[in-house]
């Protein structure tokens, strides 16, 4: 990399929180399936509780449906983690005068490319509260703001400010929102 190129990697869905949620949903789904089968067969398949005492038609059947729903949700979560949806890079190239924003999508990669001269400012947005938002985005001429930071867990304020200031300094544009 030369001094005229800045490349930032963006973390996708391969985060610890996503792994923990997918594992919890998977374990819960297996638990519901075993409880449903215990109710149907009349034998305890779980090492705790006494699910064989459940009546199959209302309770066991509903637990079986919960296990199907959990299996579908867990499959989706593990697929999103395997594909690493949302990961990608932000590439700012002064030599060629191009900004390339690329992300991995569900079916195919998403790539946005536009001239460097269209960048008017770097915007740092901080909103605390119930629906907190902390992100760095590009203000573009004739387009809406283009977010650059990852989705999910908000970045620490110091890191957010540092990334925004570094990018604004590199591009030679104003930093807005602080």
From Swiss-Prot:
Keyword terms of this UniProt record: Membrane, Photosynthesis, Thylakoid, Transmembrane, Transmembrane helix
Residues passing through the membrane, by range: 19-39, 61-81
Localization per Swiss-Prot or TrEMBL: Cellular thylakoid membrane
GO biological process: photosynthesis
InterPro entries: PSI_Ycf4_assembly
Superkingdom: Bacteria
Protein's membrane topology: Multi-pass membrane protein
Alphabetical list of Pfam families matching this protein: Ycf4
Signal peptide region: none
Cellular component terms (Gene Ontology): photosystem I; plasma membrane-derived thylakoid membrane
Protein's job: Seems to be required for the assembly of the photosystem I complex.
Family assignment from sequence similarity: Belongs to the Ycf4 family.
Record's protein name: Photosystem I assembly protein Ycf4
The species this protein was found in: Synechococcus sp. (strain CC9902)
Gene encoding the protein: ycf4
């Amino acid at each position: 990399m030369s001094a005229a190129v800045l490349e930032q990697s963006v973390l996708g869905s391969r985060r610890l929180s996503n792994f923990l949620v997918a594992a919890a949903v998977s374990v819960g789904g297996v638990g519901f399936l075993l409880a449903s089968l215990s109710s149907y067969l009349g034998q305890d398949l779980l090492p705790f509780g006494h699910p064989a005492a459940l009546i199959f038609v209302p309770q066991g059947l509903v637990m079986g449906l919960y296990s199907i729903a959990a299996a579908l949700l867990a499959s989706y979560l593990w697929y999103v983690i395997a594909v690493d949806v949302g990961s990608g890079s932000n590439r700012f190239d002064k030599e060629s005068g191009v900004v390339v924003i690329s992300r991995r999508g569900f079916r195919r990669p998403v790539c946005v490319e536009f001239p460097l001269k269209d960048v008017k400012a770097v915007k740092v947005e901080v909103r605390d509260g119930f629906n907190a938002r902390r992100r760095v985005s590009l203000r573009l001429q004739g387009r809406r703001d283009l977010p650059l930071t990852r989705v999910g867990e908000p970045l620490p304020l110091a890191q957010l400010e540092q990334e925004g200031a570094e990018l604004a300094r590199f591009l030679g544009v104003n930093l807005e929102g602080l």
